[in-house]
Regions:
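Anion-binding (especially nucleotide phosphate/pyrophosphate-binding) glycine-rich loop
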Residues: 1-77
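Residues embedded in well-ordered beta-strands within globular domains across many folds
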Residues: 38, 68, 100, 242-243
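Hydrophobic, well-ordered secondary-structure segments
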Residues: 52, 56, 70, 74, ...
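Phosphate/pyrophosphate- and phosphate-bearing ligand-binding catalytic cores of soluble enzymes
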Residues: 16, 102-229, 233-248
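A generic local secondary-structure boundary/capping motif
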Residues: 16, 56-59, 67-71, 84-91, ...
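Structural signature of FAD isoalloxazine-binding scaffolds in flavoprotein oxidoreductases
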Residues: 17-35, 82-113, 127-134
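Short, basic and Ser/Thr-rich N-terminal targeting/leader segments
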Residues: 3, 10-12, 95, 166-167, ...
Length: 248
């Protein structure tokens, strides 16, 4: 800030699409240097860069349930809080007790769950330009074998239904109220639709995959085409879940 250089903070980058021209300014990765996890009773305190899978496994080893849904999400806990990540009917807001952030002036703030304005794939963190540094999760006692059994079941379901063999930025569009994005895309006849190296997954139409040589421009064009065709056929507006950053 002293030198007026723009900066961006990344976790694992799981739900991001970076423009083909890259990101102007400094990019700060939060994963390796900020991945500490501590357990205290039923609470887990994790630095923002800690991976969800690692936290879920730590919770299981300590007989703490509540993180099962997140075990297969390939992201950091900081990023998961920012977008209120979720799967299989559960969301981060179900287990967050409080979050520590830095504001634009570098002051540390402690925010409880209600102060985060958590909704479907939403929090107030981006609009307030906060940087998540640490998260406190409140979990519940549960038998470790039951936890691991559920985690295994959910991961198998994920592998069965999602195109994990191809690179993607995860679920491409948010779920419109009363609909499922993937089904709308499929019903619009767009299964397998391709622009350059980007393709609507034939396995799950809610995912846009990289077949090997896709550019960010390919993916953006495909997303526009899909959104336009779904709106034209069904009158439903698809809102991107993928966050686009950098220069396109």
């Amino acid at each position: 800030r002293q030198y007026h250089v723009s900066y961006s903070f990344f976790g694992n980058g799981s739900n991001l699409l970076v423009g083909d021209k890259g990101i102007r300014g400094v990019v700060i990765e939060m994963t390796d240097p900020m991945g500490n996890i501590e357990v205290d009773g039923t609470k887990i305190t994790a630095q923002a860069g800690a991976m969800l899978s690692k936290i879920a496994n730590t919770a299981a080893s300590n007989g703490l349930g509540g993180m099962e849904f997140a075990a297969g999400i390939p992201g950091s806990v900081g990023g998961a809080v920012v977008m209120n990540a979720g799967a299989y009917g559960r969301e981060m807001k179900d287990i967050i007790e409080k979050v520590y952030v830095l504001d634009e002036n570098g002051a540390q703030l402690e925010l409880d769950r209600d102060a985060l304005d958590l909704g479907y794939r939403h929090s107030c963190i981006p609009e307030k330009k906060y940087i998540v540094t640490k998260v406190v999760l409140e979990l519940v006692p549960r038998n470790e074998a039951e936890i691991r059994s559920e985690m295994k079941e959910l991961n198998e379901k994920r592998a069965e239904k999602q195109p994990l063999q191809y690179p993607s930025a995860g679920s491409t569009f948010k779920r419109p109220e009363g609909y499922f994005a993937g089904k709308l895309i499929m019903d619009a006849g767009l299964r397998g639709y391709q622009v350059g190296g980007a393709q609507v997954s034939e396995k799950h139409c809610g995912f846009v995959i990289n077949k090997g040589d896709a550019t960010a421009a390919d993916i953006c064009q495909l997303m526009r085409d899909v959104s336009d065709k779904v709106q034209a056929q069904f009158g439903v507006v698809l809102e991107p879940e993928v966050k686009m950053i950098g220069e396109f």
